[in-house]
Every structure is written in C-alpha cells, then in structure tokens.
Amino acid sequence: MGMWCTTLFMVSCVSICLILSHVQEVEAGAPPQDCWNLVTFPAKCGIHGKKKCFKEMESKYQQRFLQCTCKNLKPEPKSPKDEHDCTCQRANPYECNS
C-alpha cells in the first residue's frame, strides 16, 4: 500500500509539471507575423527606388524597416501625376498597429 501511494504521488507530480509547462507555452503565444506597410507616394521610383522608399517610409512612420520594394503606378486618365507604391517590412513586428 505504501509503495502504491508513493508511485501515485510521483506520477501526479510529474503530470502536474507537464500540464503547467504546456500552459505557459500556450500563454506565451506564437511570435507576431511579419508586418508590411504599403503607401503610395508622388513621383516615380527612379533608379534607387528601394532607397527612396526606405527614406520615405522611415520619415512617415519614424520606425526602421528591414526591406522595401518600389513599384511605379500607371497614371490614371484623370490624374496625370506619376506615383509609386512603397511596400516595406517593419523591423519590429510588435509595432505593426502604430
């Protein structure tokens, strides 16, 4: 009887430890997804479009970006202005909503 109680106690302790460690992992959650911003700016991309987008986006958001792409937009018939889209990945995905 004494050995059975000791074994049951040990199994209970191990089970509780495993359950608690799993709960802590679930509460921590998965890391956030990459955060991308797309903004349209006036003028064309030019030769150094990526650098231009880095500067424009960092100026607009006051944050650091990891990578950017620049894409010239086709002018609409009503608007003769040249425009480009900057798509950039934020360095800190936790600041995605700001």
Curated annotation (Swiss-Prot):
InterPro entries in alphabetical order: SCRL
GO cellular component, one term: extracellular region
UniProt note on tissues of expression: Expressed at least in stem, root, rosette leaves and flower buds.
Signal peptide: 1-28
Disulfide bridge positions per record: C35-C96, C45-C70, C53-C86, C68-C88
GO BP: any one term: defense response to fungus
Keyword Metal-binding: no
Compartment annotation: Secreted
Keyword terms: Antimicrobial, Disulfide bond, Fungicide, Plant defense, Secreted, Signal
Short name of any one Pfam family annotated for the protein: SCRL
Family to which this protein belongs: Belongs to the DEFL family.
Protein name per UniProt: Putative defensin-like protein 233
Primary gene name: SCRL22
